[in-house]
Every structure is written in C-alpha cells, then in structure tokens.
Regions:
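Terminal leader/tail segments of proteins
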Residues: 1-127
Length: 127
C-alpha cells in the first residue's frame, strides 16, 4: 500500500481522506478486452489496481492495446492519488472510455504506460 507524499496541491484532499489506499498487483489472468466483435486489447501482463471507494480495475500495457483503433481526446482529469489522466475514444458510443496516467505519482508509478477501460463500455474476459 503506497504512503502518499504531501505537496501543496495534494495536501487539502489527502488530509480529508486519511485512510485511503491503493494496491497494485500483477494479475494472474490472461485478459481480453472487446467492444462487440472488436478485440481492443489482449494481455498476459496486466495489473490490477485496488482502490478505496472504487471497483478493481485492470490496467494493460500500452503495447498490448490496439491503439490504432483509439483516438486521443482533449479530456484530462485529476486524481490526488494517481495524478492527471488522459483519455481515448473508439467512436461516438465509446467516448473517453479508456484512460491512462502518463506521468503518475511516484506511489503508483507501476501504472505508467498502462491503460484501463471503463467496464460498462467494454467486455473484459479473464482466462
């Protein structure tokens, strides 16, 4: 479990949620991500991120994702525990459904160069 470092931008939020935790582990599953019949990603090297107040999320290495199907968007969000997230879309029905922390905070640096998918927009198979 990472110990979160304080800086002036993170301090107000981190002090309000003192027992927040994030755990990152290597998944033991073969993961396939599909949108309909389209295989978006397939990996044996995914990570699973367990975070307070969130469902577990699989993060897959960029090299295992068919990035040619995705279009980067202008959306950027901020998480005081992970950093700034960038997003990708597949089509008008799948807007901003893939995200990545390109420069995550040191406590979660393992997810650098990994992407995750909103599970309500894709089918994730585990084998």
């Amino acid at each position: 479990m990472p110990q979160f470092s304080m800086n002036e931008s993170r301090r107000p939020i981190l002090e309000q949620i003192p027992n927040y935790s994030i755990e990152i582990a290597r998944s033991q599953h073969h993961i396939i991500v599909r949108s309909g019949n389209i295989v978006l990603a397939e990996s044996d090297e995914s990570l699973i991120l367990r975070e307070t107040r969130h469902e577990d999320a699989f993060y897959l290495p960029k090299r295992d994702i068919n990035l040619s199907l995705l279009t980067p968007t202008d959306l950027s969000t901020y998480c005081p525990f992970k950093g700034h997230a960038s997003y990708w879309s597949l089509n008008e029905n799948h807007i901003n459904f893939v995200w990545s922390y390109e420069d995550p905070y040191p406590e979660v640096k393992a997810i650098r160069s990994y992407l995750s998918f909103y599970t309500d927009k894709v089918m994730i198979e585990t084998k």
